[in-house]
Amino acid sequence: MLELTMASVSGTDAGATAGMQMADAPSEPGAMLRVGRDRGACRLATPDDWLFVSRVHLEFLCGPEGTWQVTWLRGTHDDPSSEVRFALVGGAPQALPYGGTAKLPPGGAGEIVIQDRTGPCSVNVGFYHEA
């Protein structure tokens, strides 16, 4: 099972958890969770006017062995309006490249942050991948 929690944070309410959303999916091949502005395609949806987040920004996908990965999907622009950082609990944050994929270790937990390049807004997605 993969469990996600998401909070949309602006500079004025840093640290607030109001508006937190949660989603989960079983660790079955082909299971998918998405994060983005498109409420029809994404289980976790950001505010509509946060244009630094793509319609479908992050895709969590379960592979054939029941392991999960996250991909920052490429959008229509060559130069994205955001940066994405990935960190496991206890580890240093590292950049997730535009179009890049990171594996989520079984039993692992951490956070993925989508940061607006032009302002203080961010989308913080916490994850826990049950072993």
Regions found by a protein language model. Name each.
Residues 54:
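Beta-rich catalytic cores
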Residues 57-59, 63-115:
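Forkhead-associated
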